[in-house]
């Protein structure tokens, strides 16, 4: 079950799972949603949810570009992930280093910082093979 109780919120979402969340949040009165994703080919799909599409790459774009999008927002939902594409190096780059980039971008926001909601997953079929960056902290 999904529950969202902030009013007059300006939300920001990151990556795949965000399509469903963008639809849910965009349907709420007084809520504006911005969705960040890396592939411009998804712009129409994102816009169809009611969210404002922004194309940025966790792998390639600098932290400051994310900060500029986060300015004035109340909440950042981080749900990005490599999704098993590109092997362990890409998973580390997106899932771990990408999360750090978002944390750093939020820290650079002037004034009130947006809250962060981190959506994460791990392969529970075999918990003994967790990526090192999931358990190393």
What role is predicted for each listed range?
Residues 1-33:
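N-terminal Rossmann NAD(P)H-binding glycine-rich loop of SDR-like oxidoreductase domains
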Residues 15-19, 39, 43, 63, ...:
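Short, structured coil/loop segments at alpha-helix boundaries
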Residues 27-29, 47, 110:
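Short, structurally constrained coil/turn elements
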């Amino acid at each position: 079950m999904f529950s969202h109780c902030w009013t007059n919120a300006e939300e920001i979402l990151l990556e795949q799972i965000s399509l469903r969340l963008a639809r849910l949040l965009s349907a709420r009165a007084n809520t504006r949603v911005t969705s960040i994703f890396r592939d411009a080919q998804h712009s129409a799909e994102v816009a169809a949810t009611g969210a404002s599409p922004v194309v940025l790459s966790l792998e390639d774009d600098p932290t400051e570009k994310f900060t500029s999008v986060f300015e004035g927002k109340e909440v950042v939902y981080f749900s990005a992930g490599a999704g098993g594409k590109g092997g362990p190096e890409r998973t580390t780059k997106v899932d771990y280093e990408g999360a750090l980039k978002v944390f750093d971008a939020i820290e650079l926001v002037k004034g009130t910082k947006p809250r962060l909601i981190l959506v994460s997953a791990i392969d529970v079929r075999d918990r003994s093979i967790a990526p090192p960056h999931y358990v190393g902290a």
